[in-house]
């Protein structure tokens, strides 16, 4: 495990596990874990931006990002009523559909196109009208609070990053986010945080830090760490592109021999 507090070098998995030479595109799968509002999605966004992928047509992207929130299980009417009052624990492992998460990541690793619903935080439900289509890519970022919690899912990752941000900063980010973007009121946000979010982080999320290959203190503010990770991913993409070009040349040469 590497803690990137004052990092100027970075030793990361080299992507050998991702089959660049296979005809089917098997991506390099990166897990990005961390507490609520730690900056996981922002880290993924910055990685995408620096690699020139954010504005690219989604059918052509070499790097894609997926949120674990899309794998919350459907709530019962009683659970939805609790959720509206901030009384449902969305930070507990049982809140997620582990099997769907696992099968979807397996299909992605097999190079299949998959469709993933978005999550509507205002209604606490999956939005199947707004489906994210994930096309085969070279690198896939999968971010969420508990992406390292489930053993069989954790084993799928070629690289594991943990975004480590102090609890005061995370709470300061979560309150305005949940009020402005998710339609919550202050009392509900604070009740949910103290009752569920904080205890669940300490019990389920924080212990998974030990599984990380790299810890990123201060999240997206740690530009040095992000630059090093971007450089490493760039090397993986370059290797993949080189292998694909080599395969194309070999196929072309083979065709020429058959023609003669």
Curated annotation (Swiss-Prot):
Binding site for substrate: 91, 119, 174, 184, 192
Family from the record: Belongs to the uridine kinase family.
UniProt organism field: Drosophila melanogaster (Fruit fly)
Keywords for the protein's UniProt record, in alphabetical order: ATP-binding, Kinase, Nucleotide-binding, Transferase
NCBIfam families with a match to the protein in the record: PRK05480.1
Molecular-function GO term, any one: uridine kinase activity
Protein name in UniProt: Uridine-cytidine kinase
Pathway membership: Pyrimidine metabolism; CTP biosynthesis via salvage pathway; CTP from cytidine: step 1/3; Pyrimidine metabolism; UMP biosynthesis via salvage pathway; UMP from uridine: step 1/1
InterPro entries in the cross-refs: P-loop_NTPase (IPR027417), PRK/URK (IPR006083), Uridine_kinase-like (IPR000764)
Gene name of the encoded protein: Uck
UniProt function note: (Microbial infection) Required for optimal replication of E.chaffeensis in the immune tissues, hemocytes, and fat body.
Disulfide bonds listed in the record: none
């Amino acid at each position: 495990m590497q803690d990137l507090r004052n990092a100027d070098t970075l030793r990361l998995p080299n992507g050998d596990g991702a089959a660049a030479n296979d005809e089917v595109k098997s991506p390099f799968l990166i897990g990005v874990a961390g507490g609520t509002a730690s900056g996981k999605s922002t880290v993924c966004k910055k990685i995408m931006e620096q690699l020139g992928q954010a504005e690219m047509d989604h059918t052509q992207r070499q790097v894609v990002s997926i949120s674990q929130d899309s794998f919350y299980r459907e709530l019962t009417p009683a659970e939805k009523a609790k959720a509206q009052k901030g009384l449902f624990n969305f930070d507990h492992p049982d809140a997620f559909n582990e099997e769907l998460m696992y099968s979807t990541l397996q299909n992605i690793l097999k190079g299949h196109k998959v469709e993933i619903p978005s999550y509507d935080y205002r209604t606490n439900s999956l939005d199947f009208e707004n489906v994210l289509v994930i096309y085969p890519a070279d690198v896939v970022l999968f971010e969420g609070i508990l992406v390292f919690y489930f053993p069989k899912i954790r084993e799928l990752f070629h690289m594991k990053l943990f975004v480590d941000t102090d609890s005061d900063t995370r709470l300061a980010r979560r309150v305005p986010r949940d009020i402005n973007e998710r339609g919550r009121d202050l009392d509900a946000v604070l009740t949910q945080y103290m009752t569920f979010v904080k205890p669940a982080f300490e019990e389920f999320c924080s212990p998974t830090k030990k599984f990380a290959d790299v810890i990123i203190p201060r999240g997206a503010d740690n530009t040095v760490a992000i630059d090093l990770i971007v450089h490493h991913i760039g090397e993986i993409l370059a290797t993949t592109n080189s292998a694909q070009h080599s395969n194309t040349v070999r196929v072309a040469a083979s065709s020429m021999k058959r023609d003669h």
